[in-house]
Each structure stands twice: as C-alpha cells, then as structure tokens.
C-alpha cells in the first residue's frame, strides 16, 4: 500500500500577529476614562487657590484644573504606557512593539478629534474648545511622532536584516508602501509645524495639518495589519463628520455694517456687525469665528477662520468688535499697506463673510453669578474682552468693588474706544460709585497727536496663536516695562498727567500718562476687599500679551485670588 505524502499546514500569521488588538482596545478605554475624569474635574474640581494651602499645592491644583498639557499628558500617557511592554520579548519579538507604536498612535486619534469639537456638547457646560488648544497642540505632536517612529523603526529593522529585501518589504508590498507614504506625509507635517515655519506661513501649515490628518485617518486602515476599521476608523470618521456638520449647520452669511478706523494714528479699529447673527443671549467675553469664504468654496475648508472677541453684551443693538489689524506699514502709508499686505486679514465693508459660530468664553459660570469683588486688567486689543465684563458687573447691584485697568501705547487707542462708547450711548454715571472705576495707562505721550511707531511682526495669519499657541501678536510689544516711568516714552516738555477727560464718564474713567505702573499698588482696595468676602466672590481677569498675563498670574497666586487669563491675539487681530 502506497503511503500518502505528508502535508504540512503553515499558519498564515505568526502567533504574535494579533498581539496588539487588545492593547488598542485598552487605549480606547483609557481615552474614555480620561474624558469622564475630565468632565468630573471641571464639574466638581476646585480651581480656587486655597488661602490655607501652600503656593506650590495651589499651583498644581490650578494647572490640573486648567488642563495643563504637561500634567494631563503625563497622566494620560502613564496610563497607556503601563502595559505597553508586556509578555513579549523586546529582543526576539520586537516586531510586536513596533506594531504597537503604530496602533497606539491611531487609537489616540478619537480622543484628539473629540476634544477639538466646536461646540463640544459633552463638555460644553464646563469647558470650551479654547481650553484644549495647548493640550491639542502637544497631543497632536506626540501622536504624529509615535506614528513616525513606528515607520522609521521598521525601515531600520528591514535595512539591517540580511535575510530581508528592503525594496520588497517597503515598496513592493502595497500595505507597507501605503505606510511609507503616511510616514512621508507625517514628516512633512512635523517640519511645517516647527515654530519658525508655522509663523512664516501659517496657511501652509494649516492646509498641510488638515490634509495630512485626513490622509492619516483614511490610509492607516489600508496599511494596518491586523485591521483597525472597527472601532477606530468608524469612530474617527464619525467625529470628522461631526466636525464638518458643525461648520455647516451653525454657519451664517455676514455683512459688515460699519468700520471705524484711523490708520494714521493706530491700528486699533472698531467693526460693527448685525445683531441678528447671534442668538438672543451670549456670555460676556464670548467670541465668534469668521471666514472670508462661503461654505461651498473649498478654501472655506482648507484655510483657517479668524476668531474675534465680542465687545458687546447680549442686550446691545449690534455686535461690536474692537480689534487690532496687522500692519507692516511705513509711516504715512498705513491704509495702502494694510489693504495690500498678503500676510494679514482685515474685515472690510465691501466684502461678504461667513460667520462659522459663536463660542462662550473660558470663564467659570460661578464667576458671573457669585462675583462681587472684581478686577480686570487688559492691554491693547484686550479691551474687547475686558469691556463687556466690566459692563456686566457694573450693572449688578451686589458688586462691592469693580476696577478695570487698561494699558495702551498711545492716546489714539483710547479715543477709538471712547468713540465706541459715545456711538452706542454707553454711559455709567447713573450707577456710579466710588468702588467702580476705569484706569487707563498710556506708555507714550498724552496727546491726541501722538503717533505710534508700530512694532509689528510679519505674521502669516491672524489665527496661528489661537490654533497652535505660538505667542506672536500685535500687542506683544506692549510690555509691562513700558509702563515704568523710567522706560516710558519720554518728553521733557510733557509732564506726568492724570485726567478724566470725558463729560459723560468723567468721574469713572481716569487716564494716566507716564505714570509708573505697579499692579499691587493699583489693586490695594481690591485686595483689601478680597479679605472681607467669600473667596468665590473675588476674581481677577487679565487679557493681554504674555508679560501682562504672567504678572497677573503671579499676583493672583501670591494673594490666593481666583483668576482667568487670555492672550490678546485671541481678541481679534488674530494671526487666537
């Protein structure tokens, strides 16, 4: 009898082929747990600096509440990396860990997409999307670096293995070649995201950022073995779809009603929009995002929109913006340069725009309802955030102390805001008291003819800081050092002045020129009042360049005072 030949069956996949599937699910579960923890933190967490705790403990508590990237990313990646090295040998089964890097990068994308939703209905009550901008910036970079390392390590592994053809592995195998293309795209994105490159041409970065993200989401399932179509591709595509729907459903056509500008003296301008573009109620300090393109235009989706803080209150008859326009002009040619400068964005009456949506400020709800001892300090275009807050608290009967400090470079900026108040019939005299006041500090000469030699940055887009957190803005040269008497612009014939130059609000607004500025001196009454009221009733708001925000944060940490800060380029001259 003839024996039948021996048939040997070879497994299509090695025993480690499916080793990372459970790890991908684990990362997804950690992402969900992080979101739940974040929602609980913002709903029940304490951001108030305790007067009985140490300054270090208060700082950690605030950074945790404020979604500081260093702390939150540290917690998140500690959780996802704890089981990263498990069971398999790093020397003999290194492929498992190289594949695990790739799955980790893709499994983290749903969390990143979810946190950047505008609006985010799950976290809307206690968070705004602006709270996540620093986190998103660093989280995105880490995800792309992990994905890039996955590709680089595989190329190195194949290159040093004499038993493997690099060409056959990398080029001839379709799914590996797709991965190689993804790596090239990710590398290009990382190059474009480097600070100098991003600031030089933010629009290029923004286009590359969006296109590479979409390519990464759609091409990775073709490359991945085993597949990631469910649940990761499904989740990512669903979240992308929600992003698209948000930019369609909430968008409205927009026309500029009026624009008040005097480029020969200042690049601070007042823009008026129709009241009907916003809902009946919006919080003081809210902002809008505007695109110069219609929704059917591909550039609406490819290029960034521009955020502007609303200087009005919900009860006003119009929506007003007080913004700084980027200028690279030489003296005497402001208008021409502003209009022709390709690296700037300006709102003009003769053009149509699209309002993408309105967004609440990153201000806790209890501040509006419980605040009775309020200080607001702002610089330059930060007045657009400070003024509606001042008006809101000014109209409240239970407010015991209210002071707004505005630091500017020349008197023309004050004139423009004064004109805005007059045009809208905004006077404060009927409810005026000794504990409610506005102080305006001018670093230059106190004269209506003073002309500011603007120090500007060649900015590609008014949006770059707001999107990615690079600190370049029109108010950055408004340094606190300019308000020290020895550093202020000096003129031997111009004495220090302190005036209340308006008839309507003369006893409310005090304008000071060439006075040295010390925050602790200006807020003595505020600090004294804070010791007599509940800690939740005392708040300091600050909006301006980084030097001003750092000064405000230090003051609040030292005095154990609640604070909310915002960078000026959020305000509108946005390159936020």
Swiss-Prot record:
Keywords: Electron transport, FAD, Flavoprotein, Ion transport, Membrane, NADP, Oxidoreductase, Transmembrane, Transmembrane helix, Transport. Residues 250-388 form the FAD-binding FR-type domain. The keyword Transport applies. The chain crosses the membrane at residues 21-41, 70-90, 101-118, 142-162, 177-197, 204-224, 230-250. It is found in: Membrane. One of its GO terms (cellular component) is plasma membrane. Residues 480-507 are annotated as: Disordered. Residues 480-505 have a biased composition (Polar residues). One of its GO terms (molecular function) is ferric-chelate reductase activity. Disulfide bonds: none annotated. Gene3D superfamilies: Nucleotide-binding domain of ferredoxin-NADP reductase (FNR) module (3.40.50.80). InterPro entries: FAD-bd_8, Fe3_Rdtase_TM_dom, Fe_red_NAD-bd_6, FNR_nucleotide-bd, RBOH/FRE. It is a multi-pass membrane protein. Its EC number is 1.16.1.-. Belongs to the ferric reductase (FRE) family. AIM14 subfamily. Interacts with ribosomes. This is Probable metalloreductase AIM14.
């Amino acid at each position: 009898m003839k024996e039948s030949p021996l048939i040997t069956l070879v497994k299509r996949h090695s025993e480690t082929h499916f080793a990372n599937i459970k790890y991908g699910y684990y990362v997804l579960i950690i992402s969900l747990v992080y979101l739940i923890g974040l929602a609980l933190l913002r709903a029940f967490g304490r951001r108030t600096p305790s007067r009985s705790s140490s300054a270090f403990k208060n700082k950690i508590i605030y950074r945790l509440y404020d979604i500081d990237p260093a702390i939150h990313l540290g917690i998140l990646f500690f959780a996802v990396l704890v089981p990263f090295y498990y069971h398999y040998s790093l020397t003999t089964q290194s492929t498992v860990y190289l594949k695990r890097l790739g799955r980790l990068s893709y499994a983290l994308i749903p969390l990143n997409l979810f946190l950047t939703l505008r609006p985010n209905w799950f976290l809307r009550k206690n968070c705004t999307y602006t709270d996540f901008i620093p986190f998103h910036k660093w989280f995105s970079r880490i995800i792309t670096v992990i994905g890039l390392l996955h590709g680089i390590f595989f190329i190195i592994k194949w290159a040093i293995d004499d038993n493997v053809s690099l060409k056959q592995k990398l080029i001839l195998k379709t799914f590996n070649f797709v991965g190689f293309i993804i790596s090239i795209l990710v590398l290009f994105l990382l190059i474009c995201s480097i600070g100098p490159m991003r600031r030089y041409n933010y629009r290029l970065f923004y286009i590359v950022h969006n296109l590479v993200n979409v390519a990464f989401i759609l091409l990775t399932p073709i490359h991945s073995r085993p597949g990631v179509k469910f649940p990761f591709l499904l989740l990512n595509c669903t979240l992308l779809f929600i992003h698209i729907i948000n930019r369609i459903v909430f968008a409205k056509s927009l026309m500029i009603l009026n624009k008040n500008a005097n480029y020969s003296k200042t690049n601070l301008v007042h823009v008026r929009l129709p009241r009907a573009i916003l809902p009946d109620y919006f919080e003081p300090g809210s902002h809008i995002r505007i695109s110069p393109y219609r929704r059917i235009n591909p550039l609406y989706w490819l290029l960034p929109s521009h955020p502007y803080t609303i200087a009005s209150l919900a009860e006003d008859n119009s929506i007003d913006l007080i913004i700084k326009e980027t200028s690279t002009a030489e003296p005497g040619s402001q208008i021409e340069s502003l209009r022709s400068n390709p690296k700037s964005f300006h709102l003009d009456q003769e053009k149509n725009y699209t309002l993408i949506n309105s967004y609440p400020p990153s201000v806790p709800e209890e501040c509006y309802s419980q605040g009775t001892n309020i200080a607001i300090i702002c610089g330059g275009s930060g007045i657009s955030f400070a003024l509606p807050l001042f008006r809101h608290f000014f109209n409240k009967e239970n407010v015991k102390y209210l002071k707004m400090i505005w630091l500017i470079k020349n008197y023309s900026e004050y004139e423009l805001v004064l004109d805005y108040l007059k045009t809208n019939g905004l006077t404060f005299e009927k409810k005026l008291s000794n504990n409610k006041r506005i102080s305006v500090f001018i670093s230059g000469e106190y004269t209506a003819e003073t002309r500011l030699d603007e120090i500007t940055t060649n900015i590609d887009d008014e949006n770059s800081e707001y999107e990615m957190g690079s600190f370049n803005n029109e108010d950055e040269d408004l340094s606190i050092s300019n308000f020290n008497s020895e550093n202020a612009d000096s003129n031997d014939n111009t004495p220090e002045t302190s005036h209340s130059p308006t008839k309507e609000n003369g006893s409310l607004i005090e304008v000071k020129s060439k006075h040295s500025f010390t925050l602790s001196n200006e807020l003595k009454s505020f600090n004294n009042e804070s010791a007599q009221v509940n800690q939740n009733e005392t708040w300091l708001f600050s909006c301006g360049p980084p030097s001003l925000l750092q000064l405000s944060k230090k003051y609040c940490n030292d005095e154990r005072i609640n604070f909310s800060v915002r960078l000026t380029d959020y305000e509108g001259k946005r390159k936020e």
